[in-house]
Swiss-Prot record:
The chain crosses the membrane at residues 4-24, 356-376. InterPro entries: DUF445, UCP032178. It is a multi-pass membrane protein. One of its GO terms (cellular component) is plasma membrane. Belongs to the UPF0754 family. This is UPF0754 membrane protein SERP1382. It is found in: Cell membrane. Keywords: Cell membrane, Membrane, Transmembrane, Transmembrane helix.
């Protein structure tokens, strides 16, 4: 009886030691959050591993996301996919549809170009109109757009940038929240794990690829909602808008294109003999064919222009956004307690398994110690 009690006692003692040791080891990953000192000497293992390596972890995560998850090539591929093209074209169609409901008149457009519509009635319409437009283009083609357009119009365009930022963030959230976005993140993560081999395989001791992909998805979605992200996107759009304003007119529209559009407007004006009356009526009533032209032809060209322009300047855009630094700064702002809860939430089952394994191994070792103690 004494022998059995000895073995049982050693098993219980070994299990307690093994389990508690693993529990302490897990706790030491996170705690303490700050270093402790005795006199001038720092107590070993303070702070915990994750608080101590926090900046390095943030830097590595930012590097992984920038180099392997959200890359320039991936964004270019997404931009050139039919779904993205259709989405952009639908947005342009939506804006053209709004034009149908606006009370923009030819008189306002002509006045914007410096043309007195009433004076056109007294001159040969064709010669006067085309000559005036061509003269205006020749006079302004080497001027910057910001020097040509009224300041009120430029301010109105600039005011739309925040709406574009909200739209981009919303589309990003919709994509990341979709099944396709979830699948793409998992596939990228799976490719990354396969490329990195054993080192990354150690991470799977604490969490599965599914849980990591799920967490990345949630954090990326949260990132699109973060004010700092929206602020950076708005800044990039503002910078690109300022660059666009500084382009010369002939960089935006070529001479032949300008002549084609001028001729189109002229043909529509010649359709109406009562020019003064017609120019004061909304475009949607006067020249519905022009709206149709915008819908059928211009929207496609604008879509191609947006996609090609974005792809061309994507490197500069990514540099200005600095995704790696953005992620690193965001992670460094997280409260350590939040990071602890986040990791425990992801790897809860695995951590419990490690603690259970400590109890089991400790019990087994205690059993053999008890057996050895009997014969010693």
């Amino acid at each position: 009886m004494h022998t059995i009690l000895l073995v049982v006692f050693m098993i219980i003692l070994g299990a307690i030691i093994g389990g508690v040791t693993n529990m302490i080891a897990i706790k030491m990953l996170f705690h303490p959050f700050k270093p402790y000192y005795i006199f001038r000497f720092r107590i070993p293992f303070t702070p915990g591993l994750i608080p101590k390596r926090r900046e390095e972890i943030a830097r590595k995560i930012g590097q992984v996301i920038e180099e392997h998850l959200i890359t320039e090539e991936l964004i270019r591929q997404k931009l050139n996919q039919p779904q993205s093209r259709n989405m952009i074209q639908q947005l342009i169609h939506k804006q053209i549809s709004k034009l149908k409901n606006d009370d923009v008149t030819i008189k306002k457009i002509a006045g914007f170009l410096g043309i007195d519509v009433n004076e056109l009635v007294d001159y040969k319409l064709t010669t006067k109109f085309l000559n005036k437009l061509n003269f205006w283009y020749e006079s302004n083609k080497y001027r910057k757009l910001s020097e040509i357009l009224p300041q009120s119009f430029l301010d109105q365009c600039k005011g739309q940038i925040e709406y574009i930022t909200d739209f981009l963030c919303e589309r990003a959230r919709n994509y990341l929240s979709s099944e396709k976005g979830e699948r793409d993140i998992y596939e990228l993560l799976d490719t990354f794990f396969n490329e990195k081999g054993r080192i990354i395989g150690l991470l799977q001791m604490f969490m599965t690829k599914e849980s990591i992909a799920d967490r990345i998805q949630h954090e990326l979605i949260r990132l699109t909602q973060h004010p700092q992200s929206q602020k950076i996107i708005t800044k990039v759009l503002n910078d690109e808008y300022e660059t666009f304003k500084d382009k010369n007119l002939d960089e935006i529209i070529k001479e032949q294109q300008f002549k084609n559009y001028s001729q189109l407007v002229l043909n529509e004006l010649k359709t109406y003999l009562n020019l003064k009356d017609k120019t004061e009526r909304p475009i949607k009533q006067v020249v519905p064919q022009f709206i149709q032209f915008l819908e059928d032809d211009t929207s496609k060209r604008m879509t191609d222009f947006i996609i090609k322009g974005t792809s061309k300047h994507l490197t500069n855009i990514m540099k200005k956004i600095n995704l790696r630094q953005l992620v690193e700064e965001q992670i460094n702002t997280f409260d350590l307690k939040y990071i602890e809860n986040l990791i425990i939430d992801i790897a809860n089952k695995e951590l419990k398994l490690i603690m259970t394994l400590g109890f089991i191994l400790g019990g087994i070792i205690g059993f053999f110690q008890g057996v050895i103690a009997i014969f010693v």
